[in-house]
C-alpha cells in the first residue's frame, strides 16, 4: 500500500500553532503555582494552605526552604497531632483549646508540642508576605510608637529576641494588656499560654533558615523583619 504524504494547509498550520500556544500558556501558568491547597486530613486537623506560592518569598526565604519547612516539618506536626488525638475527647477541641488545656501536663507533652507547633507555623506563614516590611497601618503604628518609641525601637527588640533565643524557638510581637511587647518562647511554646495576644512572629528554629543562611540567624531575622513582615496581618490581630 502506497503512503501519501500528508498535505498541510495554511489553515491547519494556523490551528496547530494556536493549539501549541494555548498549551504553552497553560504550562506557564502551571509553572508559577498560586497559593498552595490545603492537604487532605487524616484526622480532625488539616495542614492549612499557604497564603502564597512556595517561591513567593524568594530570595529572602527560598522555595527549597519553604518546601521542607511547610511540606515536611509543618505537615509532620499535623500528622503527629492527628495520630495522638484521634479517638480522644481532644479531637473535638480547637488548637487553642488543646494548647491551653495540655500545657504543663507531663503526660500530654507530645500532644501539646505538636498542637502548638501547628498553630505557631500557621501563624508564622500569615506573618509573612512578599514585598512586606515598610510602615504599618496607622493604628498599629501609633501603638508601636507608644510602646517602643518608633519602628527602629521595635526592630531592635524583635531582632534581639530572635537572636538571643537559645536553641529553637520564636520571637513575637504581642499585645500584653493594653500595651505592645516583644517576647520570645522556646521550642513549641506560645504566648497563648501566657495570656498574651500574638500579633506577629519570626520562627527561629534552624529549619526555618539554615538552608539559606546557615548559622547567620541575625541576617535571616533582619531580612524577614525588613522585607517580609506582614503588618496588615498584625494590624488585623490588634483589632480582633
Which residue stretches match the model-derived regions?
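N-terminal secretory signal peptides and thylakoid transit peptides that target proteins
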Residues: 2-21
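Short helix-capping/linker segments at secondary-structure and domain boundaries
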Residues: 24, 28, 126-136, 214-217
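C-terminal segment of N-terminal export signals and the immediately downstream linker at the start
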Residues: 27-61
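All-alpha RGS (Regulator of G-protein Signaling) helical domain and cognate RGS-like helical scaffolds
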Residues: 40-44, 71-78, 82-184
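Soluble non-cytosolic domains of exported or imported proteins
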Residues: 60, 64, 68-75, 228
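Hydrophobic/aromatic-rich, well-ordered segments within soluble, folded domains that form packed cores
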Residues: 69-75, 119-122, 200-211
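An amphipathic alpha-helical core segment
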Residues: 160-215, 223-232
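Low-complexity, Gly/Ser/Thr/Pro-rich intrinsically disordered linker/tail segments
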Residues: 232-240
Amino acid at each position: 500500500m502506497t503512503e501519501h504524504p500528508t498535505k498541510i494547509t495554511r489553515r491547519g498550520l494556523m490551528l496547530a500553532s494556536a493549539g501549541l500556544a494555548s498549551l504553552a500558556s497553560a504550562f506557564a501558568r502551571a509553572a508559577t503555582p498560586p497559593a498552595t491547597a490545603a492537604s487532605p486530613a487524616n484526622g480532625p486537623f488539616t495542614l492549612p494552605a499557604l497564603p502564597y506560592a512556595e517561591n513567593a518569598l524568594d530570595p529572602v526565604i527560598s522555595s527549597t526552604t519553604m518546601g521542607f519547612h511547610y511540606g515536611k516539618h509543618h505537615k509532620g506536626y499535623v500528622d503527629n497531632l492527628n495520630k495522638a488525638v484521634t479517638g480522644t475527647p481532644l479531637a473535638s477541641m480547637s488548637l487553642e483549646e488543646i494548647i491551653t488545656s495540655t500545657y504543663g501536663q507531663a503526660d500530654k507533652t507530645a500532644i501539646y508540642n505538636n498542637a502548638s507547633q501547628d498553630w505557631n507555623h500557621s501563624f508564622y506563614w500569615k506573618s509573612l508576605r512578599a514585598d512586606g516590611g515598610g510602615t504599618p497601618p496607622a493604628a498599629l503604628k501609633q501603638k508601636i510608637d507608644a510602646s517602643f518609641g518608633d519602628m527602629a525601637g521595635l526592630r531592635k527588640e524583635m531582632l534581639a529576641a530572635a537572636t538571643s533565643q537559645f536553641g529553637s524557638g520564636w520571637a513575637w510581637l504581642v499585645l500584653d494588656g493594653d500595651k505592645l511587647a516583644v517576647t520570645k518562647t522556646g521550642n513549641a511554646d506560645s504566648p497563648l499560654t501566657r495570656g498574651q495576644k500574638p500579633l506577629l512572629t519570626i520562627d527561629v528554629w534552624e529549619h526555618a533558615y539554615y538552608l539559606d543562611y546557615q548559622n547567620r540567624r541575625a541576617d535571616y531575622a533582619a531580612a524577614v523583619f525588613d522585607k517580609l513582615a506582614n503588618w496588615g496581618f498584625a494590624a488585623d490581630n490588634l483589632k480582633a
